[in-house]
Amino acid sequence: MDQKTVKKNRLMFPLGTVGRDMMYQLFTNYLYAFVLLTRQLDKAQLATIAAIMVAARVFDALNDPLMGNIIDRTRTKWGKFKPWLVIGILTTSLVIYAAFNTKLQGWPFVIFFGVIYFLYSITYTMHDISYWGMIPSLSTDAAERNLLTSRTNLFAGFGGALANFLIPMLTVGAMTIGRSSVTAYGVIALIIAVITPLFLCFTIFGVRENRAYEKEPAPKISFKKIIRTIVGNDQLRWIIPIFLLQQIGNGVVLGGLGQFYIYFQFGYAGGLYSLFNTIGMLATAVLMILYPMISAKVQRKALMKKLLLASIIGYVVMLAAGLFGSSLGMIAFWIITLGFMIANVGQYGFYLILMISILNTVEYNEYTTGSRDDAIIASIRPFVTKLGGALIVVITTVTYLLFNVTDTTNQISDYEMKAQKAQQVVVEGMALKQSGDEKLATVLKEIKEQELGVFVTDISEDDLKAVVVKNDEAKLNEVLDKVDKAKLTNIDDVLSKVESGQTVGLLLTMVILSFVFMLLTYVLYMKHYKLDEPEYDRICKELEERKAQA
């Protein structure tokens, strides 16, 4: 592959994933929050939703490797990856929009959630496996692959960071779009569903891969081949559970526990969680930029020791500030955020190392079996990520039930939904085909019958009349702002009654579990993964010699 194409791929391939990671963050990290903040669910319904997530991931155990095999077998004039990028991203966009734009409640919502979640598992897999499966076909050079992988993760991190900064800020608190979490999530889902395919166009139209695979006959699809590839590759067998442990440890904080810990401890302000998220992830951006230079000087296993130490320091800081910093007020928030940032240096460094370790098993597979099976092996990363996400949901749900988090979130969702209804009653009152006094009487009757009075206590009848009778737009915004203010005041009152044991429980769970899973990852990797830099270079050199002799 000529140098001009290599340089173009370095830009076009990473650009394609910016929107994909915004989509992933919305569905993975905020779907649960959307459910808790906009739906009234009892414990049975919440447990069922968690079970659906786990069941969908078990389904992915078959779907991901099978999809990888289907991609391996695809032969078109556009290659084997790009057709699935197009099909997958368009269908996922439709699913994402539907997921966050439903008015269903209770068991009907749970059923709808199950259908949507399984559809997402299928459609996201199509473009995720085909996207990451392209990397081995773009380069076999270790340095170039490290550069491409780290740069792709940098762009992915940018998309994820942008989503993690904007979504909480625009869905919770004073800056909520439409003054309603229900409305805000729907609008954000629409925006992401539109821009994600546009970003992926950079990859679809701008990337050129090595299509040497087209000279070989398309492999047959069989579960036997999938299982044989996984079971027959001892390094892949070990890296799967190692990567799973890392994904769980890395995702516990951002999987929901961190979000509600911030709300319970520091207030119902999405902007605070946006800062926690963004600043906490800031160090990972620096690491993504520097990783190619670091990896050229420090071997992976030596680097992991330093990364583990960084995370230990970060988690100790988080615990100290959370347990002993109650008198510090918002200073404690900034210390916890700083600790999270330090811990993420280690966690994300582990992630980069394990990403490369998975990809390097492609050449190992070719070395030991004669077959690369790159799409099947590439499917392992998204499968393990999804499985880890499902287990995080289990951990999160059990924690929520254990510390009675849903008792609080149900009260919050009740205020969110009723405030939206109060705003709707006022706006729709303006369009009523009645006389002025009749319109006002109808609006007041609706407010009383639907028990929305708590949101209009600070609104005079004259102001309400100016809106529904005179259609005063300026007064309308003033009235809607007062409804929103009443909602936030009542939610703050709910949060003031949260017991300290609940917030401490969330803190201890997310910090201790994150560290334990990271430590297990480190121990197993050091003991069982043998494809370090010298060994990988030796394997690649021998493969080149075999091809030269063939």
What does each model-found stretch correspond to?
Residues 1-550:
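Membrane-embedded alpha-helical bundles of multi-pass transporters/translocases
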